[in-house]
């Protein structure tokens, strides 16, 4: 459908089938319209990177629509916060010339604490397993959200996400298999999730125009999921190592500043810190060499990252190199787990010593639970 206006605007609607069924769904709070078959493929990047690549601002490009299964839905619920409802009521009173009562402190406190409502779209595979959740801001009328055919990435949970850099990729999971999928819609208000639309089926199909297609799509996905589980473990290890460094720093500060603590334990802390640094070098490489541009072997995280870089935009068989990188990273990480377990036990031993000496709080210790009124 092509539309043009006298204001020089020009619109092209690639799929307006939802509008044909809109009238019968106006009375419902929410509806997910029937979806046409979604074609799964990897977007081409002829300029080497996303968009205009390195061509400069003089090279004009326009963004393509997002790649994925397009979910068109109708939402007819206001989902206003208490503050929004109060202000709306106050405007009516002002318009009538009536007095506006100032809200109570409890009302204001409740408004300050109230989270804005949101929608959760859940994607299920044909067996009913949840494979992805997408959070969306509620908006009245006909809207669209796109599932990028990706499963949930197994990297660390983050409160905020940022746009990938020029040479980076957005955090993503492996590409799902073709087949039947389902999507449901929940609204969440004040922490209470309410089902608005139950599982709605849709079909996804691979475009098979590949030079070197994988013999088994299932085996390819199994390898990618295996790699993603390794990423899950290595990412978690990185966070634990960061916490261990913080714990050791505070333990050392306590020994140096608090009375009646054995200062000879500083040497013990330094030994554990060196142990932590050695583990970090295995995980992420040697920063002393990196700062001086000196060559070094690939770290565990680097090997995992290379496999993901090679395989996440690829539908061919894993290469011998990718299999070798996974095997090497897995074997090395098994040793790291053993070392980190020993390190954690040693740090807990020092923290127990601080507990016995009634030292004030340091990260990793629940000192507040030991207090009682005197």
Each model region followed by its residue ranges:
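Glycine-centered tight-turn motifs at strand-turn-strand junctions
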Residues: 130-177
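Mature extracytoplasmic or organellar-lumen-exposed domains after removal of signal/transit peptides
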Residues: 187, 200-202, 233-374
């Amino acid at each position: 459908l092509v539309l043009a206006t006298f204001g020089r605007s020009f619109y092209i609607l690639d799929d307006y089938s939802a509008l044909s069924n809109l009238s019968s769904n106006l009375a419902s709070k929410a509806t997910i319209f029937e979806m046409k078959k979604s074609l799964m493929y990897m977007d081409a990047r002829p300029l080497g990177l996303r968009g205009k690549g390195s061509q400069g601002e003089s090279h004009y490009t326009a963004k393509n629509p997002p790649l994925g299964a397009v979910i068109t839905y109708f939402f007819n619920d206001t989902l206003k916060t208490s503050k929004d409802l109060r202000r709306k009521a106050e405007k009516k009173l002002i318009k009538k010339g009536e007095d506006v009562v100032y809200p109570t402190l409890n009302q204001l406190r409740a408004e300050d604490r109230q989270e804005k409502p949101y929608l959760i779209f859940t994607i299920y595979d044909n067996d009913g397993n949840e494979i992805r959740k997408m959070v969306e801001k509620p908006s009245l009328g006909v809207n669209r959200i796109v599932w990028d055919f990706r499963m949930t990435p197994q990297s660390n949970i983050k409160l905020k996400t940022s746009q990938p850099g020029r040479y980076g990729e957005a955090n993503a999971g492996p590409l799902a298999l073709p087949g039947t999928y389902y999507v449901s819609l929940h609204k969440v208000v004040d922490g209470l999730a309410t089902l608005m639309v139950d599982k709605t089926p849709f079909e996804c199909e691979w475009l098979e125009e590949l030079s070197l297609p994988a013999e088994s799509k299932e085996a390819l996905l199994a390898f990618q999921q295996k790699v993603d589980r390794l990423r899950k473990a290595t990412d978690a290890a990185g966070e634990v190592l960061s916490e261990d460094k913080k714990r050791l720093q505070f333990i050392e500060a306590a020994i140096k500043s608090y009375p009646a603590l054995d200062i000879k334990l500083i040497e013990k802390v330094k030994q554990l810190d060196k142990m932590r640094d050695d583990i970090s070098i295995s995980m992420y490489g040697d920063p002393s060499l990196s700062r001086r541009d000196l060559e070094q072997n690939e770290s565990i995280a680097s090997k995992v990252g290379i496999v993901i870089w090679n395989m996440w935009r690829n539908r061919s068989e894993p290469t011998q190199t990718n299999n070798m990188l996974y095997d090497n990273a897995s074997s090395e990480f098994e040793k790291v787990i053993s070392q980190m377990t020993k390190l954690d036990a040693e740090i807990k031993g020092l923290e127990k010593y601080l507990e016995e000496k009634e030292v004030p709080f340091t990260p990793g210790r629940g000192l507040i639970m030991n207090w009682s009124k005197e």
